[in-house]
Amino acid sequence: MFRDFFSFRIFGDNLGMDLGTSTSSTLIYAKGKGIVLNMPSILAVGRKDGRIVAVGKEAKEMLGKTPQNIVVVRPLQNGVVADYDATQKMVEYFVSQIQPYHRLIGPKLVIGVPSRATKVEKKALVDIATHLGARQVQLVHEPVAAVIGANLPVSEPLGSMIVDIGGGTSEAAITSLDGVVISKHIRIAGDEMDQAIILYLKENHNLFVGEQMAERIKINIGCTHPPSRNEKMKMRGRDLSTGFPNEIEI
């Protein structure tokens, strides 16, 4: 059942949406086109009037560089809606990038949600999608979606284990017969790794780097076990002793 749904054989005009947390991205999938949008789930807004200054990639590039009158907002926390209005504005902007007239105008929308999401958190997502014009909204637990994406058994009486490391949370789950049998999550994930890199460089190399640089370090040379060969990377930041820009290689 779920595999048919995600392959979009049983619906006509559909979109699939994965709302990433914090600095991870929101993905939108369109039938026949694949992934049509991949943008960081971030907004930059005015502190006083709440006016949107930047969304997605442009907002992410402002991390650590915003003036006092602008603040970077992460409307999604731990995989669910933390700021309803900001999330609605962000999703509306994302949809406007792929659909004319800035509305969904009829598509059926599949949205991934954490398996631990409450009824209130799920309703918030449905309300946002309905406001944008989706004629039907289907929420699917993210572990089930991940199993389908990995082409593992989902409808059969077989267990599949999946570990999903996101931006704000990491979730491990066992799925079977179109559902989640058991799942556990911790609030340690990609963002926590970035902060650990920032702290390490500050304490061991007297260098302050921003979140974007920390993320690049994690992606380029981060590993979960001792590497077979030493990877090196040059990184730029601010020398905490002099206050001037500095570059080191690790």
Question: Which residue ranges define each predicted feature?
Answer:
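Nucleotide/phosphate-binding catalytic cleft detector across ATP-hydrolyzing
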Residues: 1-165, 173-250
